Amino acid sequence: MKKQWTRRSAAAIAMVTTLLLSSHSFAASEKTERVDPRNEAYAKQHADQYESWRPTSDSVQIEDALAEDPNMVILWAGYGFAKDYNKARGHFYAIDDVRETLRTAGPTDENSGPMPMACWSCKSPDVGRVIEEQGEDGYFSGKWARLGSEIQNPIGCADCHDTRSEEFKNGGPALAITKPHVERAMNAIGKPFDDQSRLDKQASVCGQCHVEYYFTGKTKAVKFPWDKGTTVDEMEEYYDEIGFSDWTHKVSKAPMLKAQHPGYETWREGIHGKNKVVCVDCHMPKVTREDGTVYTDHKVGNPFDRFEDTCANCHTQSKDMLREIVSSRKAQVLKMKLTAERQIVAAHFEAGAAWDAGATKEEMAPILQDIRHAQWRWDYAIASHGIHMHAPEVALEVLGSAVDRAADARTKLVRLLAKKGITDPIEIPDISTKAAAQKALGMDMEGMEAEKKHFLETVVPKWDQQAKEREAADYHPL
């Protein structure tokens, strides 16, 4: 009798534990069908969309943004982006690019390397799959290399669509948010996904990734800083209130913020967003085949490449005229961007000189706050890809405020340096090239590149083989 009671009690405890675990952090989906993250799995079902997605692989060339603008090496001194920052390529390369960047370094096992698991979060439909299977804590916990063999398929179908729904299986879009942290963010700004209009949903699925975010808690989980809103001021206020910083600047020791790519936020504030012109209208237009079939072109790209299907739907001006307008705005934004950079770079070096001259934390605190705010505003504008087209007025206003904050910092620094007996201009080292700027910071680029090469040659092939074996066991062959 006692043994029977013990067995029943153990079974009951196990059942309760199972229920608690399954309800924790979105741990298990109510759906019994496993999500298939392989984009090729939908090639027949959505042939037009798949065949138009594949050419996102055409953007083979890697453009080095640091080589183009070495100021950014100094602006991100002490942070991973000073090592390596390339311009965005097509979705097809999402996995390759995050593996190959120096920012993820060269982990030798699942517990090494500088980056958290969160760095996969916008790279693959495997992320949503793993969250379903292991819960949010199960996904986010640990280092980036921990699930390298699990995160294998580049950005694609199951990132933005409910691929298991009858709507999708019958040829419909079935737009979906596939990550719980995005659902919470949309709720925070009063836009629950299920209540959104079709147009808003088309923007929100892009807003799963083309946004500002940060890592929080023990697991370094992704969170969008939208609790107070999505403008540059509202997010700055949020970060200041919680005392968050991404890193401490190597030169100035300022507690810095690294804007990611707040395209969704700046789009909302710009003329296109306010007029409900959404991402797909310009970057994934509806096109018509010769047989009259209409479908959404999934080769995300420049609207000028498909002018008649994009811009011409709203604008009466010629392609040449609109291109000239956009080029002019881009030049204006670039000019203000470089102006802000020169001021902020100088502020970092002047702050470093103030520390060297014996400045105290109390003396430096308001100066470092100005530098933090200046660079946050600069980064918010320049990290939002295409802001010169999405919201040029937002870019110019925000960059103007970055210049103002940097000027505030430098004015205070002039007084503080004079107080310490320094009245000559602070010398800035040679930062005319990417290599020179990295050298000025004492960065061992050869060592980093060798470490990355070893990782790509030894660790990544094992990941790929393990993934191949797992997918062969879990899914039907393609």
Swiss-Prot record:
Annotated source species = Aliivibrio salmonicida (strain LFI1238)
Query: Per its UniProt entry, which superkingdom is the organism in?
Result: Bacteria
Residues that hold Ca(2+) according to the record: E212, Y213, K258, Q260
Q: Where does this protein hold substrate?
A: Y213, H261
Q: Kindly name one Pfam family recorded for this protein.
A: Cytochrom_C552
For the ligand (heme c 4), the binding residues are C279, C282, H283, H390
Which keywords annotate this record?
Calcium, Electron transport, Heme, Iron, Metal-binding, Oxidoreductase, Periplasm, Signal, Transport
The subcellular localization recorded is: Periplasm
Required co-factor(s) are: Ca(2+); heme c
Q: Name one GO cellular component term.
A: outer membrane-bounded periplasmic space
Q: GO terms for molecular function, please? A: calcium ion binding; heme binding; iron ion binding; nitrite reductase (cytochrome, ammonia-forming) activity
UniProt-listed Enzyme Commission number(s): 1.7.2.2
Q: How is the cofactor bound?
A: Binds 1 Ca(2+) ion per monomer.
Q: Name one GO biological process term.
A: nitrate assimilation
Sequence similarity: Belongs to the cytochrome c-552 family.
Q: Kindly provide the name given to this protein in its UniProt entry.
A: Cytochrome c-552
